[in-house]
Amino acid sequence: MQTFLNLNSFDTEILYSLENDTAIQSLEKKVKYLIIYGPNKSGKTTIAKKFSTNNNIDLTNSVPHELNFNKETYLDLNTLPGQDENFFHFLQYFVTNNIPLTIFTSENSIDNLNDEFYLPDVVSRLKQFTLCNIHNPKKDLLFKLINKYLSFKSISVSEQIIIEVLNHIERTYLSAFEAANTINHLLYENNHNINLSLIRKH
């Protein structure tokens, strides 16, 4: 029986690319106060988990009220609580105590980095951070991403199939994610058979 591809399965493999090169280099150089931001499914959480594990860095997914951090920390939070006074105290704690902090977040959080969406004190603190963007994927990375998602369930299709899929999707990480899911469903619906004609019709 076909097992549907679980695209939310935990993944520890970082796909190194030109799109995330600046972010990776900034982490390797240990930029003291850093914000890494990027589109949905761009690998921010995977990078945060991998680097935190390899370098014994604390990783948190929330802004705690009790602040007892004593070493370099990663905050992985897709939506920053810009109107929360506690978030200001969180940022201030790291700056005052000279503790390195890297924030992984969404493009929207940075696009809206102004006094309309954030407390002025929060904006002031975040502007002390170095901004580093993970860019949308180009064709080569899209190909690798689709292949990677399929490999999670040991699904293999010809290069021609993936290349054809690339002609019909947007250049986003989420599109690669959804394309792999579509390929998996087409395989299921067509008794494990898939061809270029089927892709074009879909």
Regions found by a protein language model. Name each.
Residues 32-47:
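Walker A/P-loop nucleotide-binding motif
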Residues 120-121, 129, 140-155:
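Conserved AAA+ ATPase "sensor/coupling" helix adjacent to the nucleotide-binding pocket
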Residues 169-181:
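The conserved phosphate-sensing helix
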Residues 156-169:
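Short conserved motifs of the RecA-like P-loop NTPase core
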Residues 1-29, 188-202:
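A short, basic N-terminal segment
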